[in-house]
Design a protein with these regions (language model features):
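Membrane-embedded alpha-helical bundles that constitute the cytochrome b-like, heme-associated redox core
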Residues: 1-222
Length: 222
């Protein structure tokens, strides 16, 4: 049994950091009160993580690039007719990545303009009219149910792969490696998860973190 590096370290760190921030934002908004400030921090962190993933989707390693897993309708139809165990994301999984980035990204952006009408306002709410704040707040509240559905489907897919297809996706996202026997391709490409790529990812992350800190903490006082 041969192990193949599929998911690079930056992609794995993004995945688990996003999961923790989503969990943190869900808990903090339900507790409410003073924890709404933490809800804002988690939301800003989610926005930064998604921005990082968008950039990494163009400059990252082989399986992290959007060009590797974002496919058109024909490829998706062909996959549904003849499913294969891809080394990286399948066309359906690639579509789910797009859905996650779009809906969680929109939720984070909407949160910047919302209010709970009690003690918390998003950092950008003061720059728009009350009418638009109400619209964004309602959209933010409605979208949370879509996000819950996305999370449920994601967890369901992981369980399906683990117990039905006998493929441990969670372990692969922890270690970065997949068993060659779990892939349909004969000679899968190994991701170049080396120091150069990791330094590049760190530079991108620090640049985003610095810009966000300046805008949201120093300028807006979030």
């Amino acid at each position: 049994m041969k192990k193949i590096r599929i998911w690079d370290l930056p992609t794995r760190l993004f995945h688990w950091a996003l999961a923790l921030c989503v969990l943190g934002s869900f808990i903090s908004v339900n507790v409410g009160g003073l924890y709404m400030q933490w809800h804002a921090y988690f939301g800003i962190a989610i926005l930064g993580l998604i921005l990082f993933r968008l950039i990494w989707g163009f400059v990252g390693t082989h399986y992290a690039k959007f060009s590797q897993f974002i496919k058109g309708p024909k490829a998706i139809k062909a996959y549904l007719q003849n499913p294969k165990n891809e080394a990286g994301h399948s066309p359906i999984a690639g579509l789910s990545v797009v859905v996650v980035l779009v809906f969680f990204g929109c939720q984070a952006i909407l949160g910047l303009f919302t209010t709970d009408e009690i003690a918390f306002d998003g950092p950008l709410a003061k720059y728009i009219s009350n009418e638009w704040v109400d619209i964004f707040s309602h959209l933010h509240q409605f979208n949370q149910f879509i996000l819950i559905g996305i999370v449920v489907l994601h967890v369901g897919a992981i369980i399906f792969y683990k117990y039905i297809k006998r493929i441990n996706l969670t372990q692969a996202m922890l270690t970065g490696d997949k068993d060659s026997q779990d892939m349909s391709v004969d000679e899968p490409i190994s991701a170049k998860d080396d120091g150069n790529h990791q330094i590049k990812a760190l530079v991108i992350f620090l640049m985003i973190a610095s810009v966000f800190y300046y805008i949201f903490i120093l300028r807006l006082g979030t």
